[in-house]
Amino acid sequence: MDFRKFLTYDYYLRKEIAFLNRIHSDQAIFAEARRRYYWTTSKKLNYRHPKDISEKVMWLTRYDRDPLKTRCADKYLVRDYVASKGLEDILIPMIGVWDHASDIDFASLPDKFVLKCNHGSGWNVICTDKSALDIEEAREKLEMWLGMKYGVDMQEIQYFDIPPKIIGEEFMPFLGGDVVDYKFHCSRGKVHSCFVAYDRSTVDPHQVCYDHYDIDWNRTDDIKEKFRPNRRLLPKPQRYEDMLKIASKLSEDFPYVRVDLYNCGDKVFFGELTFTPFSGIQSFYKQPMLDELGRFVSLEGIKKHRR
């Protein structure tokens, strides 16, 4: 890479972003997205003719402003969407919903539970023993998260207009172990393949292992080596065929969405619908799979948002 050329392009993007921010232009968000993409991939983001999956997800973030995406990025309202598809049985049971952390009566909660903010990702309090929980610290975290606007730094627009809430869910036994996340790449009801993440229980976050399986559960070699430490062959999930049907049904209304599920024994549980995996840039994939997923996703017929 020509580092001088790289820094020159970054300099002009910074100037453009500063100008657009001064005139409060929506375009500032996407100038920043171009800069972030360039820093991550060393390539210019092709909005005019997007080809690979990262380019197409970034294009969809800019131009596809379907309000259903905001509804389904909301960890509270997405439950209604899942239920509307006849899949209420895969939802983790709720124990409450609150507008403020001060509204939560911890004495009434079970010994094990999960509290999470609905308008972002990673804002969770996982309690496995209420007697050991620092309640005031938990309240402070939740209240802080409620006041934050998720996705601004990564231009994930689907999160911007979600009314912040705290939701409580039952603690599921599989959350305490080495859970495997099954994440299905989908488009308009079609399922392409399954991205998996496991070994999340390790202390070192760099030891989390990513892998990729085709729709027939054959492991592929499409993940870059550094993202798959301690790689091992995973058995086909017990309810895999049902998971494919669920992913198909939940993706019917979207040009691209990643449907995240869990399989615990004979039960399938809903995780979330993800419209911008890894903030839109799936750099752990080798280029051939990025291109293949890009061909899988069609942008035809999408009315481009203009502002």
Model-assigned labels for residue ranges:
Residues I126-C127, V203-H212, G280-F284:
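A short, polar/proline- and glycine-enriched secondary-structure boundary/capping micro-motif
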Residues H49-S131, K141-I157:
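A conserved helix-loop-beta module that forms one wall/lid of the active-site cleft
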Residues M1-D64:
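Membrane-proximal basic amphipathic "stem/tether" segments
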Residues F30, N263-R307:
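C-terminal active-site "lid" helix and adjoining low-complexity regulatory extension at the edge
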Residues F160-K165, V208-V268:
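A long amphipathic alpha-helix within ATP-dependent nucleotide-binding catalytic cores
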Residues F113, H192, V257, F269-G271:
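Protein kinase-like catalytic core scaffold
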Residues E136-K226:
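Phosphate-binding site of ATP-dependent enzymes
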